[in-house]
Amino acid sequence: MSLSDKDKSAVKALWSKINKSADVIGNDAVSRMIVVYPQTKTYFAHWPDLTPGSTHIKAHGKKVMGGIALAVSKIDDLKAGLSNLSEQHAFKLRVDPANFKILNHCIMVVISSMFPKDFTPEAHVSLDKFLSAVALALAEKYR
């Protein structure tokens, strides 16, 4: 699925409104993922504290949203722009790519609850397409 110019503009516009809250969004999304999808805890078993908002959760949420920020900046070529992250997740971290979709859903839930006026139906569709494209780009090295 490719992103239209309209989708790209909508994602960039939404990102410009939410990027100041990226760390909070990341923390809340990762916390939500671990609570709602407990099977994802297996990737973080080496952390001493998996409670929502813990130091490790916050740090990982910040990393995740840093990756989303990178993706927004590389929106015209996500496959090339996220190549290093794809390689890291495929070969070093060995994350099942199905988990990207789970985290994407959690990110959208958090954004929609934090920014209800900005999360219009159009923004929702464009962000969903964008995050799906990010998941696809991250899964590229698994093939």
From Swiss-Prot:
Domain (Globin) ranges: 2-143
InterPro entries, per database record: Globin, Globin-like_sf, Globin/Proto, Hemoglobin_a-typ, Hemoglobin_oxygen_transport, Hemoglobin_pi
Amino-acid positions noted as binding O2 in the UniProt annotation, renumbered to this chain: 60
Source organism superkingdom: Eukaryota
Residues reported in the UniProt entry to bind heme b: 89
GO biological process: hydrogen peroxide catabolic process
Gene Ontology MF, one: heme binding
Pfam families from the UniProt entry: Globin
Function per UniProt: Involved in oxygen transport from gills to the various peripheral tissues.
Protein name listed in UniProt: Hemoglobin subunit alpha
UniProt source species: Pogonophryne scotti (Saddleback plunderfish)
This protein's encoding gene: hba
